[in-house]
Regions:
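C-terminal and inter-domain tail/linker signature
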Residues: 1-200
């Protein structure tokens, strides 16, 4: 809570010998950000799934967890319907405090009512030109968690584009710019179950 309005943030701490060694924070101030996408007020909901310990048979080693999260970014970049990762049937994504999957109330996208895999199979995110400077500073094998950071670049050149189902839609981002992100993935049995992203 800031003096004039609430803000959403993601925070990464690196602890060494019981001392803070690194701090990384992304703060979304919806009243101050450029309005390429109009974000609703964030809705913060506790997600116990991020704390649950996975049964051993559903865990994956560190390198595989990173590969699954990296495959998500490969799928997102110039999204044309091709999947480079796997999604759990109950997968949900929250972006800047807004649930953007399985949520027909989302006003800024035509695919909000669909699940993670269905959205990507449509090629909805073609306007995401590049996912660069990817880092994976935190991996928790027991909980199936990967925290990623990086930049989403938008060239801003797309006006309209065609989804894989034949629909023609307007690109939501119309000028060149980049978002910086912190994105947390919960991965169960090799499939992405929950995504929580904060980007500015």
């Amino acid at each position: 809570e800031e003096p004039q309005f609430p803000s959403l943030f993601a925070l990464r701490l690196r602890i060494e010998r019981q001392r803070i060694a690194e701090v990384e924070m992304v703060i979304l101030r919806t009243v101050a950000e450029p309005k390429s996408i109009i974000w609703p007020e964030p809705v913060l909901v506790d997600k116990p799934v991020f704390r649950e310990i996975l049964p051993p048979e559903q865990r994956r080693p560190r390198e595989r967890l990173i590969s699954i999260a990296d495959g998500y970014f490969d799928t997102l970049q110039l999204n044309d319907g091709t999947l480079f990762t796997e999604f759990h049937e109950d997968c949900n994504r929250v972006e800047n405090g807004t649930k953007t999957t399985n949520n027909p109330a989302v006003a800024f996208t035509s695919v909000g009512a669909l699940g993670c895999e269905e959205q990507f199979r449509l090629g909805n995110y073609r306007y995401d030109t590049a996912l660069r400077a990817r880092r994976f500073p935190l991996v928790d094998e027991e909980r199936g968690l990967v925290l990623a950071s990086g930049f989403i670049d938008h060239s801003g050149v797309l006006d309209k584009y065609t989804l894989t189902d034949g629909r023609v839609i307007d690109a939501p981002i119309r000028y060149p710019h980049s978002f910086y992100l912190l994105e947390l993935f919960r991965i169960e049995d090799g499939k992405i179950r929950q995504i929580e992203a904060v980007f500015v």
